[in-house]
Curated annotation (Swiss-Prot):
Reaction catalysis annotation: S-ubiquitinyl-[E2 ubiquitin-conjugating enzyme]-L-cysteine + [acceptor protein]-L-lysine = [E2 ubiquitin-conjugating enzyme]-L-cysteine + N(6)-ubiquitinyl-[acceptor protein]-L-lysine
EC number(s) given by UniProt: 2.3.2.27
Name of protein: E3 ubiquitin-protein ligase TRIM22
A cellular component term, taken from the record's GO annotations: nuclear speck
Protein task: Interferon-induced E3 ubiquitin ligase that plays important roles in innate and adaptive immunity. Restricts the replication of many viruses including HIV-1, encephalomyocarditis virus (EMCV), hepatitis B virus (HBV), hepatitis C virus (HCV) or Zika virus (ZIKV). Mechanistically, negatively regulates HCV replication by promoting ubiquitination and subsequent degradation of viral NS5A. Also acts by promoting the degradation of Zika virus NS1 and NS3 proteins through proteasomal degradation.
Subcellular location: Cytoplasm; Nucleus; Nucleus speckle; Nucleus, Cajal body
Gene Ontology BP annotations: defense response to virus; immune response; innate immune response; positive regulation of autophagy; positive regulation of canonical NF-kappaB signal transduction; positive regulation of defense response to virus by host; positive regulation of DNA-binding transcription factor activity; positive regulation of NF-kappaB transcription factor activity
Length: 498
């Protein structure tokens, strides 16, 4: 279309009031046409100022509001002009209202949108605060710039944290690898005995490694995701700041809300206290226990049970290694069971030197074992036995079991109550409660006659020391002592190195 012709046509369809292309044109009797919104606004002003009289804004010819008529012909021309006007320059669409075809030159604060003056008069924006674009551009630009700088700074911090976590993750891997090597080296020194213990520690280490490294990996993923979100916002803000005022202000409230609400969430750091989980266990202590057990096992003697010391209440096996109760005894407060009912001595007796033996007590719920050395002739009728009945007077039951009377023993009652019996100032022994990390199925007994020591070892728990009597005074030979009590499960003396 020839430019001059285009200009003439566009002039004919331009509203004399807003100087924009006609929108919903209305024509007066004088022949002039206006946008419906424009002439309606003028009529309202005339009603207030001129007491209801209206005149054409161009030629001042008076008219009645009811004589306004829609001009569809002009409306069609306007649409054709818009098509011709907009198609060559697609970029102009950004500056024109898509609803009314008017220039976008007003900013609605409530909606955060750039609108035309027709939109401003519409019901949608009624009562909203509106400003000319040039009135708010600088303030909005400053806010966007502040938001951009804050996000860039946060992103830089996130990048640094990501690098720190990456380095920390590597350090943790190296540290764990070193600890793994220590554990492997330590357990290799006692592979035969502690293979199960080694596997347990390695499993704990690997679980801790997975936990720590997974947490650090999750922290890295979280930071990567946050950086992606920040990058999207940064790109949006940079695009707006590079673009036109309309591009910058369009939907700016949403962008501002997202940028202001975005805050770097720092991942939780791995507690340094967790390093204790990865430390090699106290292998030296465990090795010391094993060494002590190995040392005393050097003195292992083949103890046999003495049938001559047994009563009809117990039975000793043919190989003289096992004793069990064959007749249970009912305990009464007034008449506690005779001590001799269950007690059995070893055939061997020791008056010097060092000796060691082991006893299998698997499955038993009661027993007493240790060392006995005769002190003086005691009336067996006054001795006492072991009781399960809660009504039994324990002071009578345990009165014999004390070093003063020649007994250095430990015992089990009621399935899980382990005790040692020491001297006391009263007539009753001092009953000590023993803690067992692992219930013993096999117990080692060590006697050092000259040193006056009787020690008990939990062979089931790598030879952990159960209890140790020191300062024992042996005036006569010492005998191994066994008492299965009225528990029908047998107790067995183990052959050396079995």
């Amino acid at each position: 279309m020839d430019f001059s012709v285009k200009v003439d046509i566009e002039k004919e369809v331009t509203c004399p009031i807003c100087l924009e292309l006609l929108t919903e044109p209305l024509s007066l009797d004088c022949g002039h046409s206006f946008c419906q919104a424009c002439i309606t606004a003028k009529i309202k002003e005339s009603v207030i100022i001129s007491r209801g009289e209206s005149s054409c804004p161009v030629c001042q010819t008076r008219f009645q509001p009811g004589n306004l008529r829609p001009n569809r012909h002009l409306a069609n021309i306007v649409e054709r002009v818009k098509e011709v006007k907009m198609s060559p320059q697609e970029g102009q669409k950004r500056d024109v209202c898509e609803h009314h075809g008017k220039k976008l030159q007003i900013f609605c604060k409530e909606d955060g949108k750039v609108i035309c003056w027709v939109c401003e008069l519409s019901q949608e924006h009624q009562g909203h605060q509106t400003f000319r674009i040039n009135e708010v551009v600088k303030e909005c630009q400053e806010k966007l710039q502040v938001a951009l700088q804050r996000l860039i700074k946060e992103d830089q911090e996130a990048e640094k944290l990501e690098d720190d976590i990456r380095q920390e993750r590597t350090a943790w891997k190296n540290y764990i690898q070193i600890e793994r090597q220590k554990i492997l080296k330590g357990f290799n020194e006692m592979r035969v005995i502690l293979d199960n213990e080694e596997q347990r520690e390695l499993q704990k280490l690997e679980e801790g490694e997975v936990n720590v490294l997974d947490n650090l990996a999750a922290a890295t993923d979280q930071l990567v995701q946050q950086r992606q979100d920040a990058s999207t916002l940064i790109s949006d803000l940079q695009r707006r700041l590079r673009g036109s005022s309309v591009e910058m202000l369009q939907d700016v409230i949403d962008v501002m809300k997202r940028s202001e609400s975005w805050t770097l969430k720092k991942p939780k750091s791995v507690s340094k206290k967790l390093k204790s989980v990865f430390r090699v266990p106290d292998l030296s202590g465990m090795l010391q226990v094993l060494k002590e057990l190995t040392d005393v096992q050097y003195y292992w003697v083949d103890v046999m049970l003495n049938p001559g010391s047994a009563t009809s209440n117990v039975a000793i096996s043919v190989d003289q290694r096992q004793v069990k109760t064959v007749r249970t005894c009912t305990f009464k407060n007034s008449n506690p069971c005779d001590f001799s009912a269950f007690g059995v001595f070893g055939c061997q007796y020791f008056s010097s030197g060092k000796y060691y033996w082991e006893v299998d007590v698997s499955g038993k719920i009661a027993w007493i074992l240790g060392v006995h050395s005769k002190i003086s002739s005691l009336n067996k009728r006054k001795s006492s036995g072991f009781a399960f009945d809660p009504s039994v007077n324990y002071s009578k039951v345990y009165s014999r079991y004390r070093p003063q009377y020649g007994y250095w023993v430990i015992g089990l009652q009621n399935t899980c109550e382990y005790n040692a019996f020491e001297d006391s100032s009263s007539s009753d022994p001092k009953v000590l409660t023993l803690f067992m990390a692992v219930p013993p199925c096999r117990i080692g007994v060590f006697l050092d006659y000259e040193a006056g020591i009787v020690s008990f070892f939990n062979v089931t728990n790598h030879g952990a020391l159960i209890y140790k009597f020191s300062g024992c005074r042996f005036s006569r030979p010492a005998y191994p002592y066994f008492n299965p009590w009225n528990c029908l499960v047998p107790m067995t003396v183990c052959p050396p190195s079995s």
